[in-house]
Amino acid sequence: MTPELAHDLKASVRSIPDYPKPGIVFRDITTLLGDPRAFRRAVDELVQPWAGSKVDKVAGIEARGFIIGGAVAHQVSSGFVPIRKKGKLPHTCVSMEYALEYGTDHIEIHVDAVKPGERVILVDDLIATGGTAEGAIKLLRQLGAEVVAACFIVDLPDLGGAAKIRAMGVPVRTLIEFGGH
């Protein structure tokens, strides 16, 4: 990715200080999603390493991962798999508890969402501590998927999430970084 593109994408993300609590700067990608040129460029850049490769499914983490993941799935001509909060999917699911900053939560996937051996790219808008992505990768692997990559528009490297995912043996692709929380 060119430095100019990284600059443009970073400029298209709104920063909201002291949200959701004092001392946190929330990185709001809805401004990037609302800019057709920035959104297109971000999706094109996310999928670039897999152009021409076999990708069976793209899995997106609720909620912004659905938006980005759907666009990525379209670009790589694959199916899309939603990973949702507990109780939101209508069919039989497998569930995974994952760590939050303070406590735990659960995510789910339909039991038939991926087949053993399918090549899956995991997508979300942002990676911070990596807890949700880690849980999603464990769910996909539980169903027999090969998670070939995890892709995020924004990385908060100070929180260590991308490093955690790489330690699981999953390549991580991020487009832009913001320091701090």
Curated annotation (Swiss-Prot):
GO terms for cellular component: cytoplasm. Its EC number is 2.4.2.7. Pfam families: Pribosyltran (PF00156). It is found in: Cytoplasm. GO terms for biological process: adenine salvage; AMP salvage; purine ribonucleoside salvage. Coiled coil: none annotated. Its main location: cytoplasm. GO terms for molecular function: adenine binding; adenine phosphoribosyltransferase activity; AMP binding. HAMAP family: Aden_phosphoribosyltr. Belongs to the purine/pyrimidine phosphoribosyltransferase family. Catalyzes a salvage reaction resulting in the formation of AMP, that is energically less costly than de novo synthesis. This is Adenine phosphoribosyltransferase. It comes from Rhodopseudomonas palustris (strain BisB5).
